[in-house]
Amino acid sequence: MQIGNFNTDKKVFIIAELSANHAGSLEMALKSIKAAKKAGADAIKIQTYTPDSLTLNSDKEDFIIKGGLWDKRKLYELYESAKTPYEWHSQIFETAQNEGILCFSSPFAKEDVEFLKRFDPIAYKIASFEANDENFVRLIAKEKKPTIVSTGIATEEELFKICEIFKEEKNPDLVFLKCTSTYPTAIEDMNLKGIVSLKEKFNVEVGLSDHSFGFLAPVMAVALGARVIEKHFMLDKSIESEDSKFSLDFDEFKAMVDAVRQAESALGDGKLDLDEKVLKNRVFARSLYASKDIKKGEMFSEENVKSVRPSFGLHPKFYQELLGKKASKDIKFGDALKQGDFQ
């Protein structure tokens, strides 16, 4: 899949999710973009919304978070605190372009999509909490841009519906990210095999949106077929934000990128042919050698022929065929046996 100038068929697409890790500072946001590029990220992703894009400014119990990292916080207040203001976007997209890192966003309502159009984004991201809103999904599909969908809380029925909508809107560029919508995510709750299931069941590009500590999960995800990795990024450990508890700092993110690149390199092309480097070591494979002096006319037997390393003699597959045949010449102990040595 082509996302901007990036081809996911050739390389795993690594996204640094900024989210709330600007900690309310535009300067921090711009520094984070530059740092993400240096850490090896292919793209920086932001979130485009106002609190009104997401919820109602209500004090009713329905709108108070219960449990988890944001326990007892009011939804409206949480989103007000975590948002990336509209007025920052121009500088964010400009900085990303200047730094040579791709930039796109997760919108959450029609007005967010309309606002983002002015930046001609390379892609859109749909958060899993919006994946059940068919009208919103269709709005994004109509944009005809590559679209990445986190599947965290989405049901199979909803995911099939998303595929149907994108097909109807003639938008083939759809990515499903395996995602566990708990913050942070315990490693035993990751269910990474779901990456394989998403690929097989929905026939779309797949990846991982990771909220766990460390970067074991992204590396494993690549081995399971992930072509997109999204991980929350922060400038350093001094950042305190709504997402900092499950984010990687510069050094950690760089280490993750290096590990992911090593993992995809280690996967290879799946072909079973021996490459040139391995073929050189074929010299240490077994072959047939004289384990004793053998006189001309003497029969080959288990007593005077042995399959040993290295491989300059006959292939061991000729061992049984050779037994009982007569030597056509004198053969010394340690001589490699050849086709012309028997009659």
Curated annotation (Swiss-Prot):
Alphabetical list of InterPro entries matching this protein: AFP_Neu5c_C, AFP_Neu5c_C_sf, Aldolase_TIM, Neu5Ac_N, Nonulosonic_Acid_Synth, Pseudaminic_synth_PseI, SAF
pH profile: Optimum pH is 7.0.
Record domain AFP-like: where: 287-343
Catalytic activity: 2,4-diacetamido-2,4,6-trideoxy-beta-L-altrose + phosphoenolpyruvate + H2O = pseudaminate + phosphate
A Pfam family annotated for this UniProt entry: SAF
EC number(s) from the headed UniProt entry: 2.5.1.97
Cofactor(s) the protein requires to work: a divalent metal cation
Uppermost EC category: transferase
PROSITE patterns according to UniProt: AFP_LIKE
SUPFAM superfamilies: AFP III-like domain, Aldolase
GO molecular function: metal ion binding; N-acylneuraminate-9-phosphate synthase activity
Keywords assigned: Metal-binding, Transferase
One Gene Ontology biological process: carbohydrate biosynthetic process
SMART domains: SAF (SM00858)
Role, per record: Catalyzes the fifth step in the biosynthesis of pseudaminic acid, a sialic-acid-like sugar that is used to modify flagellin. Catalyzes the condensation of phosphoenolpyruvate with 2,4-diacetamido-2,4,6-trideoxy-beta-l-altropyranose, forming pseudaminic acid.
Similarity annotation: Belongs to the pseudaminic acid synthase family.
The protein, known as: Pseudaminic acid synthase
Organism: Campylobacter jejuni subsp. jejuni serotype O:2 (strain ATCC 700819 / NCTC 11168)
Gene from which this protein is expressed: pseI
